[in-house]
Design a protein with these regions (language model features):
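The feature captures the ABC ATPase H-loop/switch
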Residues: 118
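Conserved G/P- and acidic residue-centered "switch" motifs that form tight phosphate/ATP-binding loops
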Residues: 115
Length: 254
């Protein structure tokens, strides 16, 4: 067996060719980031998979990355109001991820959540979500540009500051009190889940990063897209996160 740990990357259900083909897919940057900065071997976990198959996968990997996705977690998982009919959903991913999180926790396996991933962890621990953050009093518009011709640089540009909480993991990691991040999300954390800890808040008070209380391994989840060019100087925190995740996976493997 190879010396590097294996990380399972959650996929999304993508509908192609007017519904004639459905694929399990994830963004190339997630795969690239875990290979280059976490130094792990990536495998893709289908967004639709039986629980017993999932158990077999978890026996053979050493960490899980919960990726972002176009669809939002359906509100019936946290007692919210029903989505409008045109809201993108991914019920298979909802079921799979809300199943995989407690399995990972029971194994004390490293877990890293990004964008939708932080929301899934919060819901898994009994928390709730805002459907539209920008419609809440005092909250910013955290969404990406709405125009069709927006460039990737415009979509992923650094948008707002996040402030680290008093005993935040991030303060220890980079010896700073805050950091500037991108922002591409419509939903966000409302009520914090049980046994979760707030690690960072945005300037408008929205929860931007969490961890699992007293977890013996890496359990960081962030609302921003840490996978976007971690190698850039302005994104050095994100590079550190992937490196720390990789070290935790290696420790878990050993």
């Amino acid at each position: 067996m190879g010396s590097r740990p294996i990380v399972g990357i959650i996929t999304n259900e993508i509908v192609n060719f007017n519904g004639r083909q459905i694929s399990h897919s994830t963004g190339k940057r997630y795969v690239k980031s875990v290979m280059e900065f976490a130094d792990v071997v990536p495998v893709l976990i289908p967004s639709s998979i039986p629980s017993d198959n999932l158990d077999e996968i978890l026996e053979n990997i050493h960490g899980v990355l919960l990726t972002g996705g176009r669809a939002n977690v359906e509100p019936h998982h946290y007692g919210g109001s029903k989505f409008p009919a045109d809201e993108p959903i991914d019920p298979d991913r909802d079921r799979t991820v809300l199943n995989i999180i407690p399995k990972c926790v029971s194994k004390k396996m490293p877990i890293f959540g990004i964008c939708r991933g932080i929301q899934e962890i919060n819901v898994s621990f009994g928390g709730t979500l805002f459907y539209r953050v920008h419609q809440q009093d005092g909250k910013f518009d955290h969404r990406m540009p709405r125009n069709e011709d927006a460039t990737l640089e415009e979509i992923f540009k650094l948008k707002h500051r996040v402030d680290f909480t008093d005993n935040s993991y991030f303060k220890e990691l980079i010896n700073k009190n805050n950091f500037v991040v991108n922002s591409l999300h419509g939903q966000g954390i409302d009520k914090l889940g049980n046994d979760l800890v707030v690690e960072a808040n945005s300037e408008d008070g929205l929860i931007e990063a969490i961890s699992i209380k007293n977890y013996p391994s890496f359990s960081i989840a962030v609302q921003w897209h840490a996978e976007y060019h971690p190698e850039r100087k302005e994104n050095f925190l994100n590079k550190k996160l992937f490196e720390s995740f990789g070290k935790a996976c290696l420790k878990y493997k050993s």
